[in-house]
């Protein structure tokens, strides 16, 4: 009887040790499953972001988060120092653009103020994460974006160094054309920035400032006023003010104030003007 009792006790121990629940193994499986699930969700979200992005503009298909219009007046050439300063300011402005902000660069080089296609028009794809680099082309887009706008800016500056002085300088007409192309169909709540690189001396049949600024109230009553109207979409405006020796009697605070009044009337706000 004593021996049977010992065998029974031994069998019981084997049952407890060998047939118990393998909690460590279950925890490992559960942890691995959670990791794979999280990875799957991340892949899904990144791929969803890629599918929601326009492959041509790199903007979200729902629209850009912001638009920055850069208009460079090429009716007269810039000197080397002005061109380099303007280039630095444009590059700085583009680099400051937030993710999904579209940058449009136009060159105003036509006598009637009409514009061709933008030299550059892309959205900032944002800063790629480590996972983006592994499973998507965000890093490549970021590199192409920077190389693209730098090439566009360099191309633009090369052109304005070589242009011949034009007979007209239709700044208002060029701005209207650029604004229409860039953001006329934009949702009302999307912010807009405008950077103008110009001497701002309007010279066209609409208005001639080369001999003097004139009173803004007088311009509002003129025949050219109706042709100057444009909705600037609550834009925040910066002027890179290109100074010229032949316009010393025109380019002054009164001239900048004239443009500030014009922008106010067109639903925009002049934030700053810096002479170069």
Residue ranges of each PLM-predicted region?
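N-terminal Lys/Arg-rich, disordered targeting/topogenic segments
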Residues: 1-23
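Acidic, polar low-complexity linker/tail segments
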Residues: 19-69, 75-82
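Von Willebrand factor
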Residues: 63-189, 194
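Acidic/histidine-rich, surface-exposed loop or edge segments in extracytoplasmic proteins
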Residues: 64-77, 154-161, 238-243
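DG-centered beta-turn motif at the end of beta-strands
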Residues: 72-74, 178, 191-205
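N-terminal post-signal-peptidase region of extra-cytosolic proteins
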Residues: 85-92, 176, 217-225
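Von Willebrand factor type A / integrin I
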Residues: 215-276
């Amino acid at each position: 009887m004593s021996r049977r009792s010992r065998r029974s006790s031994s069998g019981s121990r084997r049952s407890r040790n060998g047939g118990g629940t393998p909690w460590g193994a279950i925890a490992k499986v559960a942890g691995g499953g959670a990791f794979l699930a999280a990875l799957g969700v991340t892949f899904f979200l990144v791929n969803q972001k890629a599918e929601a992005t326009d492959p041509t503009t790199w903007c979200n298909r729902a629209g850009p988060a912001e638009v920055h219009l850069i208009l460079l007046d090429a009716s007269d050439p810039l000197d080397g120092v002005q061109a380099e300063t303007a280039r630095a300011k444009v590059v700085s402005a583009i680099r400051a653009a937030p993710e999904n902000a579209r940058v449009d660069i136009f060159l105003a080089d036509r006598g009637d103020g009409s514009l061709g296609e933008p030299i550059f028009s892309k959205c900032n794809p944002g800063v790629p994460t480590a996972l983006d680099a592994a499973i998507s082309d965000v890093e490549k887009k970021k590199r192409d974006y920077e190389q693209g706008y730098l090439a566009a800016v360099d191309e633009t500056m090369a052109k304005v160094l070589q242009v011949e002085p034009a007979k007209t300088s239709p700044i208002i007409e060029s701005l209207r054309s650029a604004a229409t192309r860039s953001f006329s169909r934009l949702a009302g709540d999307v912010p807009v920035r405008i950077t103008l690189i110009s001497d701002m001396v309007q010279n066209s049949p609409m208005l001639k400032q080369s001999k003097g600024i004139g009173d803004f109230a007088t311009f509002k009553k003129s025949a050219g006023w109706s042709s100057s109207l444009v909705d600037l979409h609550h834009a925040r405006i910066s002027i890179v003010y290109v100074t010229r020796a032949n316009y010393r009697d025109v380019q002054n605070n009164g001239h900048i104030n004239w443009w500030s009044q014009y922008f106010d009337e067109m639903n925009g706000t002049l934030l700053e003007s810096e002479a170069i």
